[in-house]
Each structure stands twice: as structure tokens, then as C-alpha cells.
């Protein structure tokens, strides 16, 4: 799975996230995570946390 900057992904937790920084492609990303309680949290996620890419950025 090739994740790019600004892609929207679904996490294995069921939450969605927008990629805001790529630390190492295929390994680790900074993401704005839409939490199930309605809040948004910026956190580091790993490739294995991602279930599927929902949208790809146009960049």
C-alpha cells in the first residue's frame, strides 16, 4: 500500500485519518485522526495500523 501526503486512510480501530507527514514511507506517518468520540488528534501511526487507503491525494 503506497501512502502519500494528505491521503485519507481507515485505521484498524475503525477511525479515519489524514496523513500530514511521512516519516518513513511504508513505516511511519503523522496523521490527524478522527476519533470515534468526534475529536481530532494528531498522532504518529505505523503502516500496520492502516487497514486501507480511502482516498489518494492529487499531489
Regions found by a protein language model. Give the residues of each.
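Basic/aromatic-rich interaction segments and small domains that mediate binding to polyanionic partners
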Residues: 2-47, 51
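Intrinsically disordered, low-complexity linker and terminal regions at domain boundaries
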Residues: 50-59
Amino acid at each position: 500500500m503506497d501512502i502519500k501526503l494528505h491521503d485519507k486512510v481507515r485505521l484498524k480501530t475503525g477511525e479515519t485519518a489524514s496523513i500530514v507527514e511521512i516519516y518513513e514511507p511504508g513505516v511511519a506517518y503523522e496523521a490527524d485522526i478522527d476519533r470515534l468520540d468526534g475529536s481530532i488528534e494528531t498522532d504518529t501511526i505505523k503502516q500496520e495500523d492502516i487497514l486501507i487507503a480511502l482516498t489518494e491525494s492529487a499531489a
